[in-house]
Amino acid sequence: MTLRSKMTKYIFVTGGVVSGLGKGVSAASIGNLLKHRGFKIFVLKLDPYLNIDPGVMSPYEHGEVYVTADGGETDLDLGHYERFIDVELSKDSNYTSGKIFSNLFTQERNGNFLGKTVQLIPHFTNEILNTIEKIATKHKPDFMIVEIGGTIGDIESNSFIYAMAELALAKPDRFFLVHVTYVIFLEASNEFKSKPTQVSINSLRSFGISPNLVLLRNSKMVPDNIVEKIAKKSVLNKDYVISVPDMKNIYEAPLYFESQNIAQIILSHFKIKDIEPDLSKWNKLVDSIKKPKAYKAKILMVGKYVEFLDAYKSIIEAFKVSSYEENIDLKMDWVDSSKLELTNLDEFLKGYDGVVILPGFGIRGWEQKVRIAQYTRENKIPTFGICLGFQAMSVAHARMKGIKNANSREFANDKNDETYILDLIQGKAKDKNLGGTLRLGNYTTTIKENTLAKKIYQKDQVIERHRHRYEINSKYIDLLEDEEFVFSGIWNEGKLAEICEVKNHPFYLGVQYHPEFTSRPLKPNPLFTSFLRVLIKNN
C-alpha cells in the first residue's frame, strides 16, 4: 500500500514537561509501524540549538554524532530512526536553528529580502516551513515524521512550534501532532500529578494548536482516572491519550504502540484504510531478547567518554542486537582509558572474554589505548578496534616492529624523533575549521582474500560509514605488513588502509570506519556478531 500519488502527510512529535522522555524512540516506533504497513517514511529531527550541526559538540553535551550515508553529522536520534524503520536517512534528516539561520543569513546577504527587516516571524518561521516542504518534495515520502527537539515552553523552541502551527492551519488534512509528556508521580503522597502535563498542552494551545494524540510517560502505567482527567482537560477522546510506561527493552516499543492502536489512530485521522502489518520478524526479535540466554560473555569497553554512555549509543545497540541473535547474555564493562593502571593489566583483564577499543578524539588516554592494544595482542585476548581503536592497534604493531616512536600526527609533540604512521588524509591539511572537515559518510572498502575480514563479510567489497581526519600514511602500509599483520581492507581510490588484522590470534581486528552505523536490529553488522561468536567459542 502506498500514498505516493498523494501529498505527503506530516506527523509532528513534540515533548512536554521534561526532556529525555523518549520522543526519538516514539517517533521511530510510529515510523516502524507505518513502514510495516507498506508506506514510505522519511524522518526529520529539528533541533533548536544554534550549532550548525553536532559535529564539533562535546560527547558529554550531546552524546554520539550519528553519521548518515551521505556524510551528515547528525543527532543520535537518527540512529533510532534508522534502526527501527530500517531506512537510510540523509543530511536532510537533521536541521538545527543554526543551520536554518545560516541559510537565512545567506539569503539576507544576497539581497533576497529586498531591504526588508528580517525577523523571527515571518522570515525565520518561513524558512523552517520552506525547509520542511523542500525535504518532502525531494524525498516524496507518504509520511514525514518531524520531531522537534527540546520541550514545549523552551524559548529556543518557540519559532519551531509557531511554524508547526502555521503548517497545521494551512494543511489541516495533512497534519497530525503527537505530544509526548511526562506525568509526575510523587512518592511521598503515592499519587500521580497531571498539572504539568495540562500546562504543557495549554502551552501548545497558546500557539493555536492542539495535539491529536498524547503519550503519557512514566516508569509505570498511568492509571485510568489520570488518563481520563488529562483527556477531559485536553478536550481529547480518552482513546487518544495513552499511557506509555518504561519497557525493559526499547525494541518492545513498536509492539506496545501496535497494541494501543496508535498506527490505526493516525491512519483514521488521515482517512486512510488500515491494513494488517506483518510484525512477525519484530516479534521474533523481542522474543529473542526476553528468552533465557544459552551463553554468557563479558567484554571490556575501553573508551574516553564512559561517564556518558550516549556517546557510544550506536556501538552499544550494535553489540546488543548481535548478542540477541547469538543468544548471548552480554555484559559490557566500561573503563576510561586515561585511568587505566598499565602496571597491573594481568589482574585487571582477568575475567574478561574480550576487549573493545573505542573511538574518540584527542590525546587523553591515547597511550593507554596503544598499550592495551599491544597487551591484548601479545596475550591472545580477542580484541576489536573501532576508528581510534584501529589506529591504536596499528601504532602498537609499528612499535612492536621496532619503530620505537611510532605515533599519529594528531598527537604530535614537540620532539623530532616521532614517526607518524598516521597522518592527515590528503586534502584535509589546509582545512582551518573543525566542523564538516572530516572524511564522512559511505566509502567502499575492498577486502583481501584469505583474511578474517573476508571470512566475516563474505564479500569482495563492503560499504561502511566513516568519520575521521587521520589515516595510515600510505607510504607505511607495505612496511607495516608482515606475515602476522595485514591491512585486509583498502580503499582503492586513495590507497587508504581501512581494516587491520593479526593472523594466528583468536580475534584481533580493527576498522577505521564505524560499522555500528549500519547495524540494524533485524540485520546486525557481521563484525559485532563475529566478535561475539569468538568469545563464546573460547568459553
Swiss-Prot record:
Q: Identify the residues that bind Mg(2+).
A: 77, 147
Question: Which residues bind UTP per the record?
Answer: 19, 193-198, 229
Source organism superkingdom: Bacteria
Biological processes annotated in GO:
'de novo' CTP biosynthetic process; pyrimidine nucleobase biosynthetic process
Q: Which residues does L-glutamine bind?
A: 60, 360, 388-391, 410, 469
Q: Which residues form the signal peptide?
A: none
Q: Where is the active site?
A: 387 (nucleophile), 514, 516
What UniProt keywords apply to this chain's record, in alphabetical order?
A: ATP-binding, Glutamine amidotransferase, Ligase, Magnesium, Metal-binding, Nucleotide-binding, Pyrimidine biosynthesis
Q: Domain Glutamine amidotransferase type-1, which positions?
A: 298-539
Q: What class of enzyme is it?
A: ligase
- Enumerate the catalysed reactions: UTP + L-glutamine + ATP + H2O = CTP + L-glutamate + ADP + phosphate + 2 H(+); L-glutamine + H2O = L-glutamate + NH4(+); UTP + NH4(+) + ATP = CTP + ADP + phosphate + 2 H(+)
Q: Name one Pfam family in it.
A: CTP_synth_N
**Amidoligase domain: region residues:** 1-272
Q: Which residue windows are coiled coil? A: none
Q: Which residues bind ATP?
A: 20-25, 77
Single GO term (MF): ATP binding
Q: Where does CTP bind?
A: 19, 154-156, 193-198, 229
Q: Which SUPFAM superfamilies match?
A: Class I glutamine amidotransferase-like (SSF52317), P-loop containing nucleoside triphosphate hydrolases (SSF52540)
Q: How is its activity regulated?
A: Allosterically activated by GTP, when glutamine is the substrate; GTP has no effect on the reaction when ammonia is the substrate. The allosteric effector GTP functions by stabilizing the protein conformation that binds the tetrahedral intermediate(s) formed during glutamine hydrolysis. Inhibited by the product CTP, via allosteric rather than competitive inhibition.
InterPro entries in UniProt? Class_I_gatase-like, CTP_synthase, CTP_synthase_N, GATASE, GATase1_CTP_Synthase, P-loop_NTPase
The misc remark on file is: CTPSs have evolved a hybrid strategy for distinguishing between UTP and CTP. The overlapping regions of the product feedback inhibitory and substrate sites recognize a common feature in both compounds, the triphosphate moiety. To differentiate isosteric substrate and product pyrimidine rings, an additional pocket far from the expected kinase/ligase catalytic site, specifically recognizes the cytosine and ribose portions of the product inhibitor.
The task this protein performs is described as: Catalyzes the ATP-dependent amination of UTP to CTP with either L-glutamine or ammonia as the source of nitrogen. Regulates intracellular CTP levels through interactions with the four ribonucleotide triphosphates.
> Into which family does the record put it?
Belongs to the CTP synthase family.
Assembly and binders: Homotetramer.
Q: What is this protein called?
A: CTP synthase
Organism for this UniProt entry: Mycoplasmopsis pulmonis (strain UAB CTIP) (Mycoplasma pulmonis)
